[in-house]
């Protein structure tokens, strides 16, 4: 690491997952920079939030950086404000906003409902019932086209880099999961709907806003976005960026989780000595049922194993104290779970 205090003045970072309430404006990596101040060791985050979005960001320190992909796979809840009657070049308020002028074929998309054209403007206005009617189409497994402003790579290059150069590209389609989608507020005058969306990993909220607007035949984009939950972790328990400091990470507490607390969504298994020795070396285990498990032995968390019931292999291994890593202690209630 370069810059900042000298290495001797930095505090070794413990293994923590920190719930941070990111404000609108900063990038997700700005939160990582804030968490790194005064520390030495690895710091990262799981699940990027765009600068225009706010809410829950999981920042990981020390060995906890190894569980990033596990946390990224958890369902996420978003509070999404959709603005109808206009489109954005980026699908959000940071892009070029243009009034939506529907063609006859596009306007027909709203024929099923009570969409109306604004007098003298040729713009379609929608009602709360119109929005409720189309939401059913966006629950369950749906297909989204990856936005051009995403980090997904096409031809070996992130799409957003092409977008910054003004280039276009054929973006891939992906199947994603929307577990629940509820309208909690509708403003007919402003032509906005506030939605609560519980989605699977890889779902783009801005695409959801655009696709709902397209289904209504009026256009739409994400006017505001706040992530409220990741798995069982809530933004209500998060800390502010200005509170990030080595003193905060010293002990688990509100918004600061140990590895065991962060991995509580995965059941735990205590291993006998023979298998604990095998697991410590990253070998296959035969005793675990099908599924994914935290495995413990010698009084510590050894790793995360996954298998079919006929054999399990490590997904993540945690270093022993002799390897210079943390030594997550075994919680008292993992046996037989």
Each PLM stretch: what is its role?
Residues 1-49, 53, 74, 104-121, ...:
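Accessory RNA 3′-end/elbow-binding domains used by RNA modification enzymes
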């Amino acid at each position: 690491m370069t810059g900042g205090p000298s290495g001797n003045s930095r505090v070794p970072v413990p293994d923590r997952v920190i719930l941070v309430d990111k404000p609108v404006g900063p990038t997700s990596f700005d939160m990582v920079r804030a968490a790194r101040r005064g520390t030495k060791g690895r710091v990262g985050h799981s699940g990027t939030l765009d600068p225009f979005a706010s809410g829950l960001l999981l920042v990981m320190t020390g060995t906890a950086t190894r569980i990033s992909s596990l946390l990224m796979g958890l369902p996420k809840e978003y509070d999404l404000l959709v603005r109808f009657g206009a489109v954005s070049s980026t699908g959000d308020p940071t892009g070029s906003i243009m009034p939506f002028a529907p063609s006859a074929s596009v306007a027909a998309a709203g024929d099923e409902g009570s969409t109306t054209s604004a007098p003298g403007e040729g713009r379609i206005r929608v009602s709360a019932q119109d929005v409720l009617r189309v939401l059913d189409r966006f629950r369950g497994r749906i297909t989204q086209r990856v936005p051009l402003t995403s980090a997904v790579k096409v031809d070996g290059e992130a799409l957003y880099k092409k977008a910054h150069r003004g280039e276009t590209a054929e973006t891939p389609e992906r199947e994603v999961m929307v577990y629940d989608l509820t309208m909690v507020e509708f403003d007919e005058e402003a032509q906005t709907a506030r939605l609560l969306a519980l989605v699977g990993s890889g779902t783009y909220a801005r695409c959801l806003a655009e696709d709902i607007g397209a289904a209504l035949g009026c256009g739409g984009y994400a006017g505001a976005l706040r992530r409220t939950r990741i798995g069982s972790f809530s933004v209500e328990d998060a800390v502010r960026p200005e509170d990030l400091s080595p003193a905060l990470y010293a002990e688990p507490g509100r918004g600061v989780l140990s590895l065991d607390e962060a991995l509580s969504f995965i059941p735990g298994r205590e291993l006998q000595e023979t298998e604990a020795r095998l697991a410590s070396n990253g070998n296959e285990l035969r005793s675990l049922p099908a599924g994914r498990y935290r495995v413990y032995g010698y009084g510590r968390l050894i790793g995360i194993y996954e298998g079919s019931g006929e054999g399990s292999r490590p997904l993540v291994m945690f270093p022993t104290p002799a390897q210079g890593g943390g030594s997550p202690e075994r919680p008292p209630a993992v046996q037989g779970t």
